[in-house]
Amino acid sequence: MKILLLGEHGQVSRELQLSLRGQGELIVRGRDRLDLSQPEQIRQQLRELRPELIINAAAHTAVDQAESEAQLAFAINATAPGILAEEAAALGAPLIHYSSDYVFDGTKNAPYAEDDVPNPLGVYGRSKLAGEQAIQAVGGAHLILRTSWVYSLHGRNFLLTMQRLLQERDSLNVVADQVGAPTWAGSIADATRQLVERWRHGHAGPWGLYHLSAQGEVSWFGFASAIAEQLRAQGKATATLQPIPSSAYPTPARRPLNSRLDCTRLQRDWHVQLSDWHSALLECLHSPR
């Protein structure tokens, strides 16, 4: 089987390149070889490569930066997924695409289910929602996987930022009123591998929209505290953490206060096993990846 994986150097893609070994011929493309802001380039490459499965792990993920470059964010996060869906449908190839908890406004007092009405707060969330809708409008075989608070040992993310700041500073303020599930990119890749294997062996669940995040919930402050605990276990000095409200840390893009996602549907329909956020953090920190 020929698999096309987009987003070569991204957090999820890097983990997928490990998890999908043995699943077939894996063709990986980054922005240098397939620019998702160029529609004709997308069409040309897919028609030349003719993959049997397309996994789109590429995205414009700079949430604050998106506020000042909406056109680029929509080109990559909205227009490109629609084109990928069209080309995938023409090839008869399923499309797996990753979306975000930021399609919601965070006002619900419980975890969000797939059929809750989206209401994004910023450009990034609006562009991701538009990408979902573009894929759904095509109507081909697809999985849209909304995830949350992605981190890994690569790239730019909360885990790596906290590890650095906790050792550089004496005191550190961290937002405590945003709650969600930090999700290791390795866990997303492992869940994706489970989905691919079930599809390949004829045990696929229904195509469509699903939530995929770590189990459990924690605030950014709680997540930072868990990271600090692991650093101290290694004998490293860490900053004193202070909880603050979101209002004390203004950013160009507003964040939802509730980013919790209900993953029951994915577990029920596809029998995917998901780790809790704290176990996944420990696995990530001790991973040879």
PLM features: residue spans?
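Amphipathic terminal alpha-helices
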Residues: S275-R289
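Adenosine-cofactor binding site in Rossmann-like domains, unifying the SAM/SAH pocket
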Residues: R21-Q44
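N-terminal Rossmann NAD(P)H-binding glycine-rich loop of SDR-like oxidoreductase domains
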Residues: I3-S19
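SDR active-site strand-loop-helix element
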Residues: L6, R29, A57-A58, L95-S100, ...
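Catalytic helix-loop patch of NAD(P)-dependent Rossmann-fold dehydrogenases
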Residues: S68, A75, A80-I83, A90, ...
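NAD(P)H-binding glycine-rich loop region in Rossmannoid oxidoreductase-like domains
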Residues: P39-I76
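Mid/C-terminal beta-alpha module of Rossmann-like enzyme folds, strongest
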Residues: A191-T192, R198-P252
